[in-house]
């Protein structure tokens, strides 16, 4: 628990990842692992040799830095939860479970496994910058790519913004293991695993629930037990099926992602990301009508975030007009 709180206490966002990058590098040094940092700020480390699983995460969050930032604990019948606290203003702030949980999972895998690689991506929250620009040759010995960058406790993501992440062969061997932890297939939105698959990295990828909730908001919380569960699942997947390559290339299809055409170009939760042209288009903000994450006030037609739109329309059962009427009634 001490290590987890130490990690969560570090503040990092796309404008300033230096503290988190330094922390990760120090942890790798303590494990005696060699690592490299590429031109885009991605941290890459290999342990072992030959074909091996890759575990990936991103080192930025969406949250502004808080001068008097603390991590607090609260325990209830569901488990132990971490949350961020601004002690100066006496109010809750985002803890950054998205994706500090993934960082923890990567470090855990490196500690537990003898043959594994890890990549800590830069600036995922402003368009998957790290995974979009990393040299794919880094993954030449990958058997599969696992990421823990999903809300909740039970999602085994098979589509990321319309990109299929793995095929039937991987599904046949991986899902029985995931089922032991209560994980079921689900569709998700953009993250590094999806970006790599869209770039034809060549192996099966999957994104897993990491036990955080209310991501990208001041109400974000992290369930410790659910994070420990996904860490154990990742280790079991790596040990059971990580020794042989699970080749996969997605079929060409429309990709509603950050930098591609979508209902609107970017998720509207990019707040004041370092893209001044985008910032100029988002002069004010308002909570999403459904999940209350922050969206641009000038979002087309109605104020919902891309996640809610995709969950209900792109991958859901509502038509655009039906969903528009629903949001107007909320």
Tell me the role of every PLM-derived stretch.
Residues 295-300, 313:
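Short functional micro-motifs and their immediate structural scaffolds
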Residues 6, 10-51:
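A non-catalytic alpha/beta surface segment that caps or lines the substrate-entry region
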Residues 89-168, 181, 185, 193:
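Acidic/histidine-rich catalytic neighborhood of metal-dependent amide-processing enzymes
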Residues 49-115:
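Active-site metal-coordination/substrate-binding segment of hydrolases
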């Amino acid at each position: 628990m001490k290590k987890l709180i130490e990690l969560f206490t570090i503040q990092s966002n796309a404008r300033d990842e230096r503290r988190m990058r330094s922390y990760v590098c120090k942890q790798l040094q303590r494990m005696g692992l060699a690592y490299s940092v590429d031109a885009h700020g991605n941290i890459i480390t290999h342990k072992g040799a030959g074909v091996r699983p890759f575990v990936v995460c991103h080192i930025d969050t969406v949250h502004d830095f808080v001068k008097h930032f603390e991590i607090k604990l609260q325990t209830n019948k569901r488990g132990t939860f971490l949350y961020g606290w601004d002690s100066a203003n006496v109010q809750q702030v985002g803890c950054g479970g998205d994706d500090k949980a993934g960082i923890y999972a990567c470090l855990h895998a490196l500690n537990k496994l003898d043959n594994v690689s890890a990549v800590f991506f830069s600036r995922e929250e402003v368009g998957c910058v790290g995974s979009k620009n990393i040299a794919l040759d880094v993954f030449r010995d990958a058997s599969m790519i696992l990421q823990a960058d999903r809300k909740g406790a039970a999602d085994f993501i098979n589509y990321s913004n319309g990109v299929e992440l793995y095929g039937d062969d991987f599904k046949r061997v991986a899902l029985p293991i995931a089922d032991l932890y209560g994980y079921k297939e689900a569709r998700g939105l953009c993250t590094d695993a999806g970006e790599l698959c869209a770039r034809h990295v060549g192996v099966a990828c999957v994104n897993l629930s990491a036990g955080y909730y209310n991501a990208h908001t001041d109400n974000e919380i992290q369930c410790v037990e659910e994070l420990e569960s996904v860490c154990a699942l990742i280790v079991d997947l790596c040990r059971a099926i990580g020794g042989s390559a699970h080749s996969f290339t997605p079929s060409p299809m429309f990709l509603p992602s950050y930098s591609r055409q979508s209902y609107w170009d970017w998720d509207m939760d990019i707040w004041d990301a370092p893209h001044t042209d985008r910032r100029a288009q988002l002069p004010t903000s308002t909570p999403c009508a459904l999940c209350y994450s922050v969206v641009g006030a000038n979002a087309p037609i109605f104020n919902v975030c891309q996640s809610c739109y995709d969950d209900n329309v792109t991958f859901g059962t509502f038509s655009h007009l039906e969903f528009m009427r629903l949001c107007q009634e909320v």
